[in-house]
Amino acid sequence: MLDPNLLRNEPDAVAEKLARRGFKLDVDKLGALEERRKVLQVKTENLQAERNSRSKSIGQAKARGEDIEPLRLEVNKLGEELDAAKAELDALQAEIRDIALTIPNLPADEVPVGKDENDNVEVSRWGTPREFDFEVRDHVTLGEMHSGLDFAAAVKLTGSRFVVMKGQIARMHRALSQFMLDLHTEQHGYSENYVPYLVNQDTLYGTGQLPKFAGDLFHTRPLEEEADTSNYALIPTAEVPLTNLVRGEIIDEDDLPIKMTAHTPCFRSEAGSYGRDTRGLIRMHQFDKVEMVQIVRPEDSMAALEEMTGHAEKVLQLLGLPYRKIILCTGDMGFGACKTYDLEVWIPAQNTYREISSCSNVWDFQARRMQARCRSKSDKKTRLVHTLNGSGLAVGRTLVAVMENYQQADGRIEVPEVLRPYMNGLEYIG
């Protein structure tokens, strides 16, 4: 959520920045609502003061032995007017808040202006795509050769966009997640967390999934005996529970940064993706991801974004997977991001790079929703923290990249050296 004071005091400047990302802010509507809010605020305060004054007069008149009935009726009338004004003010403030919850974050000044993914800017490349002297197989074919990817079984169990992994392919999938967690905890300074896969509405509001993206979530049916408290949704990413761990907290600045990681399944409806990536593991309703989250001082967040992106890059480098780093343009960034880097890994069978990590600085956009603050040791003042999140990495897509980049002419899959300790020294699948 944007700073309400910024919306009130600099609406045109905010509208200009939001226009860079294709969002039209209705400045006139917000201005009219704000003017009405000011009028109602003053009216409410005046009625409150008048009622207090008249209430005090009742006691004084009673002490003088005067008839207090006219004053009492006047106080009652003022009370009714005050209640009506408060109700109108509350409704107006709720309307303003509902609008504010649909407004995306402002883009950082250095973010390239653009409409969609075609306007993203490549920053760098690492590694050289391998040249094969045989016909490249895609991961689906390789998975079927080794009886490791069973999409038909998943359709029987659930439906499309799910998979059953088996044998050494399932083992490599597990090895990848363990390798990522060990790297981030042992070398990059993150603490490992195990978090719920079901979260409540407040949590989803905190990180910005609600109210705007309710349709992208899988919602549970509330338990009849807990209807008021069990309205849960499956997490679309571990960013949601990890970031919300600081919701409502005041953190000493000396305890920052807080760096957290978790390996979880992620659940997404993929609304609007009908017909895209229908083959294989690229776009699933359920997929595993190792997530990184940082909670930092505001002045440290841009440096933290560079660091976090480097941590995701390290996973790809140690696996020997060619990739490119791009900065997303204003029109392609996520709702809460002010700046985002995507890492795209080389997928031989598609002869292209595909997203495997997205690392974003969210500034105080989530912290304002969550009321997550830090306290200075010197003056004891509090301010909103900045939050960052990044994939380190999407495990299924990493499996795809390893299978395809490490395939052999006979269909075997070489196990990258860094994964062999997690697979009992296995050098090849097949």
UniProtKB/Swiss-Prot annotation:
GO biological process: selenocysteine biosynthetic process; seryl-tRNA aminoacylation
Primary location group: cytoplasm
Compartments where located: Cytoplasm
Residues that bind ATP: R268, S269, E270, E355, I356, S357, S358
Alphabetized GO MF terms: ATP binding; identical protein binding; magnesium ion binding; serine-tRNA ligase activity
CDD domains: SerRS_core (cd00770)
Catalytic activity entry: tRNA(Ser) + L-serine + ATP = L-seryl-tRNA(Ser) + AMP + diphosphate + H(+); tRNA(Sec) + L-serine + ATP = L-seryl-tRNA(Sec) + AMP + diphosphate + H(+)
InterPro entries assigned to the protein according to its UniProt record, in alphabetical order: aa-tRNA-synt_IIb, aa-tRNA-synth_II, aa-tRNA-synth_II/BPL/LPL, Ser-tRNA-ligase_type_1, Ser-tRNA-synth_1_N, SerRS_1_N_sf, SerRS_core, tRNA-bd_arm
Binding site residues for L-serine: T237, A238, E239, E291, S391
EC id: 6.1.1.11
Keywords from the UniProt entry: Aminoacyl-tRNA synthetase, ATP-binding, Cytoplasm, Ligase, Nucleotide-binding, Protein biosynthesis
Pfam families: Seryl_tRNA_N, tRNA-synt_2b
Pathway terms, separated by semicolons: Aminoacyl-tRNA biosynthesis; selenocysteinyl-tRNA(Sec) biosynthesis; L-seryl-tRNA(Sec) from L-serine and tRNA(Sec): step 1/1
Gene Ontology CC terms: cytosol
Family: Belongs to the class-II aminoacyl-tRNA synthetase family. Type-1 seryl-tRNA synthetase subfamily.
HAMAP family, sorted: Ser_tRNA_synth_type1 (MF_00176)
Oligomer status and interactors: Homodimer. The tRNA molecule binds across the dimer, one part binds the N-terminus of the first SerRS subunit and the other part to the active site of the second subunit.
Domain notes: Consists of two distinct domains, a catalytic core and a N-terminal extension that is involved in tRNA binding.
Role description: Catalyzes the attachment of serine to tRNA(Ser). Is also able to aminoacylate tRNA(Sec) with serine, to form the misacylated tRNA L-seryl-tRNA(Sec), which will be further converted into selenocysteinyl-tRNA(Sec).
UniProt-listed NCBIfam families: serS
Name of the protein in question: Serine--tRNA ligase
Organism: Escherichia coli (strain K12)
Lineage, opening ranks: Bacteria, Pseudomonadati, Pseudomonadota, Gammaproteobacteria, Enterobacterales
Primary gene name: serS
